Each structure stands twice: as C-alpha cells, then as structure tokens.
Amino acid sequence: MRSVQAPVVCPAIRPRQVGACASLVNYTGLKPRSQFWGNRTKGVKSQGTTTTITLRLCNKSIKCVFSSHSDGNGSTAENFNENDEEYVNSSVVEAVEVKSGADGFMVKMRDGRQLRCVHNNPQGGHLPDYAPHPAIVLKMEDGTGLLLPIIVLEMPSVLLMAAMTNVQIARPTMYQVVKEMVDKMGYEVRLVRVTKRVHEAYFAQLFLSKVGNASECVSFDLRPSDAINIAVRCKIPIQVNKYLAYSDGMRVIESGKISTPAPASDGLLFTEQDRPNGQACLDTKEFNILSKMMQAVDEERYDEAAEWRDKLGQFRAKRNLRKYT
C-alpha cells in the first residue's frame, strides 16, 4: 500500500569489488494480506505483486529502497477518493437476522417487523432455503433503497446493535480498543468500504489517515462485520461497491409487523392479553437466553457466554424445525 524508503545498513556484508554498481533484484512474492481478527478465506487464490529492490553498495554498506506501487488492483491507499463513483454511500439498518424459506427472503428487524425481499438482479435466481442467521444489513443511500444483507457471527451483530442503541458495556470491546489505538498512534479513521465478494465471503477495507495530513493514508483488509462495527463507533461513512449493491442487493416488497391471530371478539378488548393461554412464549424464551448471554459478556464470563450462545443456536434450530414440520 505504502512506499517505504529507508536505508538498511549491513556492515557484516563485504562487497567483493569496491564501488560496485547498483544491482536490481526482482522477485514476485505473495501479496501481503492482513489477517486482522482472523480474516481467512478458503478457496481464494493469493495474488502476486512484483517488487523491485535496488541495492547500492557504498562504503561497505547496503542501502535498500523498497517500492510497491499498487495493492494489486491498481489503486493505492494514498490516492483513495471518498467520492469515488464506483462506490455508493450506505447506512446500517437495525436488522437482527435474515432467513430464506417458503415465504421468500425475510429480514427480521429489531422492532419486530418482517421485511420480505426479492433480488434486485433478475438473474439472481432462487435463493436456497436456510434457517435464520445473524446479519448486518446495509441500506444504499442513492435513492434505490436496496439492502445488502451480510451474514455474520452472533457476537459482532449483538455488539453492533449495542453501539447503535447506545447500550453501555462495562468493559471495552475490541472495537473500542482499536479506536483508541488508532487515536493514540496519531491517525484517524476516515472510511470503510465493502469492496468485493469472493464466492460467499464479502471483503472490506478500513482507511486511516494521519491527523493533520490527510494525504498520508493507510488501509487494512477486514471482515465486513469488524469494519462496520468500527465505522459505527467512529461515525464515519460506509460505502459499498456499486456492482455488489446492484448485483447482490435486495428490494423490499412487503413490510409489516409480526401478527398473531386474534380471538373471536366477545365485546371485550385485549382478551388475549387478559387471559394467558397457558402455553410458553417462544419469543420470551429466546429473549431470556439472549439476555443471559449479553449479561455474561458484560461481566466477562466468556465461557458461560459461549454456553448461552450455543443454547441460543440450539433453541432457534428447534424452533425453526417445529415451524416447518
């Protein structure tokens, strides 16, 4: 990403000839990729980048100049443009999970609404059925209203909702730690971009710039869930590659509340609430498990939180199985 020019002195190396000419060494190495927070993908071919090292022998020392002009896609972090026409601004919607089934592709919102969606791309084909998964959903702010759902792990989704609703967590999360580290190193977070999709995995980039010198920029490859969590806490723009937005985006065709069948009217209001039916409320059970998981995380009882997370997954799987059988 960046061009590094610094002398490297190796006094133990003695040139055979005094005043030797500069020699060029070309090699092709694997493109350096940050495995930030375990960002690993399977089935992705590593890209190569050609790097030139110039060695100058002078007074029994070697001066090495490293120059890398591209990050593999023809753009450098120093030259990134926040108004790039290839990207569209987006915002995070308060969605908690997505699923695909007989009713189509559904997005469950934090307030209980269910959004039924269809592919924006007519050639997107029929989505396979799958159980509810935690997700982060981005809404395009270019007037189209397209949604880009990104399936993530449970914890990044929960922490994102906590940040969006200003829920205070007793101990700093890793996203808060990263934000403070960036500040103390004299940088500021500028922008997050969802750049591409490889097979079923989305990729994102986090752009930083030196405080007081916006032209000095660096960028990191991150998982979208991590990049978006940082963006929300730093209150910076989140952009999506236009091709991804229009090819993978979903259009909302129906929006409504979760409704339960009302009993026959007998002239009294709220009869269903006044007389419990004696059956356990599955939503209440799910909420209680989720609440206990969050409480364990808040109190740093991570082993217990992992157990509640597993119980939550098992509960949701049984609930969905019961729904379709």
From Swiss-Prot:
GO biological process annotation, one example: defense response to fungus
Domain UVR: 284-318
Keyword tags: Hydrolase, Nuclease, Nucleus
Induction conditions: Up-regulated by pathogens, abscisic acid, etephon, salicylic acid and methyl jasmonate.
UniProt note: phenotype after gene disruption: Increased susceptibility to fungal pathogens.
Entry's family note: Belongs to the bifunctional nuclease family.
GO molecular function ontology, one term from the record: nuclease activity
Domain of life: Eukaryota
Start and end residues of each BFN domain: 117-252
Function: Bifunctional nuclease with both RNase and DNase activities. Involved in basal defense response. Participates in abscisic acid-derived callose deposition following infection by a necrotrophic pathogen.
Top class in the EC scheme: hydrolase
Keyword Transmembrane helix: no
GO annotations of cellular component type: nucleus
The enzyme's E.C. designation: 3.1.-.-
Record InterPro entries: BFN_sf, Bi_nuclease_dom, UVR_dom
Compartment list: Nucleus
Gene that encodes it: BBD1
Protein name in UniProt: Bifunctional nuclease 1
